[in-house]
Each structure stands twice: as C-alpha cells, then as structure tokens.
Amino acid sequence: MNAFLPRSAVVGLGLVLGLGAVPVQAAQPVVVAVDGTLCDIATTLAANAASVTCLIPPGGDPHSYRLKPSDRSQLAKSDLVLHVGFGLTPSARKLKTPGKVVAVGEVAVPSYRGTDPHVWHDPAHAAAMVRVVSQSLSSVLPASDRPALRQRTARAVAVFNSLQSWEAKQFASLPSAQRVLVTDHQTYSHLARRFDVVEISMLDGHTTGGVLRPSSLQKITQEVKASGAKTIFAPTAKPSKTLRRISKATGLPIASTPLYGEGIAAGRNAVSTATLNVCTIVNGQGGSCDQAGANGLNARWVSIR
C-alpha cells in the first residue's frame, strides 16, 4: 500500500479491494491548522491537494482558545496538525489526534529562547515557517502532488522575502527617533528586532492582576513621553479603559486602526495582514506607507495556486 495514502482513505480502499470492485480514488489528506496565520499558509501551499481546516477564526485569541467538539472531531480524522508552538495556544499541547503534530514556529526558529511566541511578525521567520509547513505537507501528500507543492513553496517564500524588503523600506522612511511601537503587551518583538524598532509593551510588568496602579501609570507615562512615540497602538477597534487612561495621561492618540497581532484580520490573509500592521505603525508614527507596494505583495500571494 502507498505509504503516503491518507488515513481517511485506508478503510474505503480496503472495502473496495475486498469486493473486487472498481478502482478507488484516495481521499485527500486532512490537515488541521490551529491558528489563522498557519491556516492561510497551509491553505495556500496545499491548494487543492489537501483538505485544510482552521480552528481559530480571524480575530480569535490563540492564548485563551479552547477546543470545541467540532474541533475534536476534525482532529480525530486528521493526517497532520499544525500549530505555532512556543506556548502561543496552551490547548495545543494536549491535542488528541492520530496525525502528526508539528509546532511549526519551534521548528522554523529553533534557537529562539524568548517569551514572545508571535514569531511570524518577522518575515524571515514567516518564510522559514512556510518551508516547515511545506515539508510537513509533503509527508502526507501523494508523490504526484509534490512537484506542484514545491513550486508553490518557492513562490510563497519569495513573497515573504519581498515582504521583508518592503517592510524594511517602510521603517527606514521614519527618522530613527520615530521608529517606536507602543502597544499594550509584547507581541511584536520579532518585528521590532528585525527592523530596529523600539517596542514598548506598556502593561507588561506594570500591572497587578490586570490593574494599573497610579504609580505604574506615572512610570508608563514618563517612558512613553520620552520614547519619541506619536501614537499608541491597540489590539482591538475598541481600546480598553486602561489604554484610554494612558492615552489621556501621555497626550498621545490611539490609532484608529488596530494592530492584528494574534493572527490574520477578518477578510485578509497572512501577507495583507502584515502590510496592514506595518502601514498602521508607519502612518501612525508620522510616515507615509507604500500602499501600492503592499497591494502588489498581496496580489502575488493570492495568485499562488
């Protein structure tokens, strides 16, 4: 029997062979991607060669996600399960599935020892994740589908390489004193490190049980005012009361467009979400983002088939 025949096809094949009936067409491999970024990468690379199911919808929080009965049903018949790793989704540590489970981020960035699991915000890491997803898919796809997978992988990696160049130009357009990213919690350290941006995660280390004390507010206000920041960036369209307090204390506005740090934005993909985030940051810090270039990157990504 073909070693790469998906689990979902084995029973049907046995029945048909037992009956001596017509030849059977193997079912597609079943792939489950836990979060939205990996889901988009897996869907793009797999094209029509595999059935890809996404567990966390756009806008969902991977940190607090809990498996639903329908998720467990998909996992029970999966050939491959993909999650970022690094503790991004704690529930992913206890997956019950007969398929192979791959912590894509941990494989792609094996030397990372920090505390920020959002590794894909660095396009170089995202390109490495594409390669890991491709290798994982190759292990469950029939041999006949692998040449096309390799072609799609090469195109996808090229897009993320171009994304890195594009992002570098956007941040380089800002004066060095304005390359500052003020957010609530550490989410963009990988992006900040790649492009020499100062990330200030205001609430990390300054809150107790989620409560911002007056002394902490004073410290945050001083740090933000001295940073060169022009804007505070929120993770949702409705900023929290805490962020509004900080905005009032610092005199800095909260960006009208939120940053999407936990996955992909609704109606967008991994690449267009990345360009949206970068344009939001650059424009908020007084720069002007290259939207035409962003649109071109997105067009290249969605054309991968």
Indicate residue ranges for each PLM-predicted region.
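Bacterial N-terminal signal peptides
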Residues: 9-20
